[in-house]
Amino acid sequence: HSQGPVVLEDRVEPEDKPYERNPGKNVMMPGNAIKRHLHVEDRMNRLEKDGSDFAINKAEYNDTSIGFITSGIPYQYVKEVFPQASVLKLGMVYPLPKKLIEEFAKKVDKLYIFEELEPVIEEQVKAWGIECIGKEIFTRQGEYSANLLREKVLGQNVETKPYPNLPARPPILCPGCPHRSTFTVLNKLKIHAAGDIGCYTLGAVAPLNVIDTTVCMGASISTLHGM
């Protein structure tokens, strides 16, 4: 989660293009899929090559004794804790710009991959034979923070202030939300319900107790058929 100032530009209306039927491109029956796979492979190869020149993939060289490859909000934490470090900020993480990453890795003495959750960038970088430090010290769990960097890289034991002793406030649907009425009826009927990701997932908790499954957006339909 993050926030920051936003500068709005003039609205640009998209070009109204007529629909053109193209089953060879859009209907992935086996014969078409085999042909289209060549286009996908070519596109990915060009993206990987051209990605090294994209402005959204930016190498910031400062102190080359330490370097970070990162993306998204973790970049802000790196800049906060290591303002003088060299940083490769990736705006496009798939496919990764191999040439740019290799050049960056050669110019820094110690390389860290600072990415939240799964080691997507890290595993690819290591597969290219580039030495780096990632999930050996950084967790796969939850959101990262500047304090995590201080603790794992600098060895600083950062003391955090305890939360004030406030009464617990469990998540609930907003007052007036129409989902409340829907779930109340479903609860009275004792119906099993398959849900999607969204605020209405709160229908699973008391006092509504309706939603039985939630996997991802759109999964409720196929899950319901399975139930």
Predicted regions, residues:
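Thiamine diphosphate
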Residues: 183, 192-227
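Flexible, low-complexity linker and terminal segments
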Residues: 1-173, 178-182, 187-191
